[in-house]
From Swiss-Prot:
NDH-1 is composed of 14 different subunits. Subunits NuoA, H, J, K, L, M, N constitute the membrane sector of the complex. Belongs to the complex I 23 kDa subunit family. Keywords: 4Fe-4S, Cell membrane, Iron, Iron-sulfur, Membrane, Metal-binding, NAD, Quinone, Repeat, Translocase, Ubiquinone. Residues 21-41, 141-211 are annotated as: Disordered. This is NADH-quinone oxidoreductase subunit I. GO terms for biological process: aerobic respiration. GO terms for cellular component: plasma membrane. Binds 2 [4Fe-4S] clusters per subunit. Residues 43-73, 89-118 form the 4Fe-4S ferredoxin-type domain. NDH-1 shuttles electrons from NADH, via FMN and iron-sulfur (Fe-S) centers, to quinones in the respiratory chain. The immediate electron acceptor for the enzyme in this species is believed to be ubiquinone. Couples the redox reaction to proton translocation (for every two electrons transferred, four hydrogen ions are translocated across the cytoplasmic membrane), and thus conserves the redox energy in a proton gradient. [4Fe-4S] cluster 1 binds at residues 53, 56, 59, 108. It comes from the Bacteria.
Length: 211
C-alpha cells in the first residue's frame, strides 16, 4: 500500500462534492415520459361514448403474465355498450402480475386498449392493485354520452370503423347526442299532451257544463 493511496481515495470524494447533484425531487418534480411510454392501461371509447372493447378476450390470451381477466356479454337494443355484438362486461388487470410489455395492445383488434403515461402504480394494498373496468375506462369527453345508448355514428359496427375520422360528427352541427335524446323525449311528451288534449270534449254546443 503506497503512501499516496489514501489521498487518491479522498480525491474521488472531493471531486464529486462540487458536482451538480443529479437527484430528482420526486414527487415534486416529475420527469417527462417518452411518447410511447408503457404505463397504466386505458380502455378507449368511440366519439359517441360507446366502448371500443368487444369482449373478445384476445388481450387476455396474449398476456404472458396472465394478468388480464375479461368476461364478455351480449349487447341488446335496450342495453348497448359497444357497436359490436358483444362488449366487455368485466375487465380487470392485475398490476401485481403485469410486466407492462404491451403485447395486449398489439393483440387488440379494435384499438380498445392502449397504454398511458401514468406510471404511479405503487400501493400498500394488494386488492387496490387489481384495476377494474371502471378504473380503466377513458373519461367521457365533450359530446360523449354515457352508455348504454343506441349507436349514434351509424347503423352497424362497420360504420364506426369505415367513417372518415376527419369528418364532422353528426351532433357537431347541432347539439350533443344527449341533447338530441332530450329533444326527442320532449317532442314525444308534447305529442302525448296534444293527443290527450284532443280527447277532452270542448265546452260548447252539444256539451253539458258540469254543475
Amino acid at each position: 500500500m503506497g503512501i499516496l493511496d489514501p489521498y487518491k481515495g479522498f480525491g474521488v470524494t472531493f471531486s464529486t462534492m462540487f458536482k451538480k447533484p443529479t437527484t430528482e425531487q420526486y414527487p415534486e418534480q416529475k420527469k417527462e415520459t417518452a411518447p410511447r411510454f408503457h404505463g397504466r392501461h386505458q380502455l378507449n371509447r368511440h366519439p359517441d361514448g360507446l366502448e371500443k372493447c368487444v369482449g373478445c378476450e384476445l388481450c387476455a390470451w396474449a398476456c404472458p403474465a396472465d394478468a388480464i381477466y375479461v368476461e364478455g356479454a351480449d349487447n341488446t337494443d335496450e342495453q348497448r355498450f359497444s357497436p359490436g355484438e358483444r362488449y366487455g362486461r368485466v375487465y380487470q388487470i392485475n398490476y401485481l402480475r403485469c410486466i407492462l410489455c404491451g403485447l395486449c395492445i398489439e393483440a387488440c383488434p379494435t384499438r380498445a386498449l392502449t397504454m398511458s403515461n401514468d406510471y404511479e402504480l405503487a400501493d400498500d394494498s394488494r386488492d387496490d392493485l387489481i384495476f377494474t373496468k371502471e378504473q380503466l375506462l377513458a373519461p367521457l369527453r365533450a359530446g360523449m354520452e354515457s352508455p348504454p345508448h343506441p349507436m349514434r355514428l351509424g347503423e352497424s359496427e362497420t360504420d364506426y370503423y369505415t367513417r372518415d375520422p376527419d369528418a364532422p360528427l353528426p351532433w357537431q352541427v347541432g347539439g350533443s347526442p344527449a341533447d338530441e335524446a332530450d329533444e326527442a323525449g320532449e317532442a314525444g311528451e308534447a305529442g302525448e299532451a296534444e293527443r290527450a288534449a284532443d280527447k277532452v270534449p270542448a265546452h260548447g254546443a252539444g256539451s253539458e257544463r258540469p254543475r
